[in-house]
Amino acid sequence: MDKFRVQGPTTLQGEVTISGAKNAALPILFAALLAEEPVEIQNVPKLKDVDTSMKLLSQLGAKVERNGSVHIDASQVNVFCAPYDLVKTMRASIWALGPLVARFGQGQVSLPGGCTIGARPVDLHITGLEQLGATIKLEEGYVKASVDGRLKGAHIVMDKVSVGATVTIMCAATLAEGTTIIENAAREPEIVDTANFLVALGAKISGQGTDRITIEGVEHLGGGIYRVLPDRIETGTFLVAAAISRGKIICRNAQPDTLDAVLAKLRDAGADIEVGEDWISLDMHGKRPKAVNVRTAPHPAFPTDMQAQFTLLNLVAEGTGFITETVFENRFMHVPELSRMGARAEIESNTVICHGVETLSGAQVMATDLRASASLVLAGCIAEGTTVVDRIYHIDRGYERIEDKLRALGAHIERVKGE
């Protein structure tokens, strides 16, 4: 397995171009199964999960090409089963189920894999599809969905806010008979982006970005061209990289209005931040950040996917900061690894108490999930000496060329090929 070797400490400064959002690109790729005509999707990041999704769409019979943009023609889809060998590495594959059953009346997806963060069950996806009239069976490790004729619109109240299940229900409802209302819907920018993509193909969706989404079913969706929004988590990660190294950065191709909660906390930490239409700049003026208190919650509150990065910020900041995780359990796996580098932290239930230290020391550490591993790489950039981050396949699932982008900011980082 590949590793990163990082030599520190460095002050990170310069410009970085933000990639398209993984968490919008994946649902949009699967939503393309609903279209009877070709679609072109621009600004799709080059990531392992994206490659896996494209492979899966090809196996289902779609024509998939990448030349800058991703081109998908799902008019000839004739296989309705997403097999275990592709699904096992990526839980996003569950998003194939809604479009398959909505357009073809049947779909099967192997129970998914991906990051091992707490309980992320597929029951909310299943309940939603059942409420739209699908029959669901769990057999031999597969979720099997079927319907006679078309799905039927329904008034669905989500038990809890779920990005994944909101996507599944919204996609399936676009081709259902009648109107579907999703109450307690997720409000994330990536949900809005997926809805806007579907609208570009002819879907009738309103209320995306609020907790009540209305979908009027149509008989079919056509083709179109759509550009995926910038990745707010990648943007936030690079802003934190500059903040903890007391540097300055400009993030290009960013979307500042998707990051309000993160920018507010960075300002609290002492960062000087400016925003334009598609850029964000951060300057620490050489100062050490101040500790901040953070509580994760669904959008528009502070995103759980930025929690590990802010844990690291607090661990090198002035003072003591509290980080409370309310979205996923078991999401502090980076804390013991950072402690190996000299960080001082205690975990109490779903809160990390971070006591800022002046410097971290390089160590051998292991990535456990996507965002935790990014925080370990950033820690290596500011630690004294050499840090080796193992199991970086997690990072490759969510960050496009992170080492090249960090190197352009002055980091001393190299990828060491595994045996």
Curated annotation (Swiss-Prot):
UniProt-annotated binding residues for UDP-N-acetyl-alpha-D-glucosamine: R91, R120, P121, V122, D123, L124, K160, V161, S162, V163, D305, V327
Record-listed phosphoenolpyruvate binding positions: K22, N23
Organism for this UniProt entry: Salmonella arizonae (strain ATCC BAA-731 / CDC346-86 / RSK2980)
Pfam families reported in the protein's UniProt record: EPSP_synthase
Localisation: Cytoplasm
Modified residues (2-(S-cysteinyl)pyruvic acid O-phosphothioketal): C115
Protein name: UDP-N-acetylglucosamine 1-carboxyvinyltransferase
GO biological process, one term: regulation of cell shape
NCBIfam families: murA, PRK09369.1
Active site annotation, chain numbering: C115 (proton donor)
GO cellular component: cytoplasm
Disulphide-bonded residues: none
Enzyme Commission number, as recorded: 2.5.1.7
Keyword terms: Cell cycle, Cell division, Cell shape, Cell wall biogenesis/degradation, Cytoplasm, Peptidoglycan synthesis, Pyruvate, Transferase
Catalysed transformations (reactions): phosphoenolpyruvate + UDP-N-acetyl-alpha-D-glucosamine = UDP-N-acetyl-3-O-(1-carboxyvinyl)-alpha-D-glucosamine + phosphate
Pathway(s) of this molecule: Cell wall biogenesis; peptidoglycan biosynthesis
Family that this chain belongs to: Belongs to the EPSP synthase family. MurA subfamily.
Chief place of localization: cytoplasm
Molecular function, one GO term: UDP-N-acetylglucosamine 1-carboxyvinyltransferase activity
Primary role: Cell wall formation. Adds enolpyruvyl to UDP-N-acetylglucosamine.
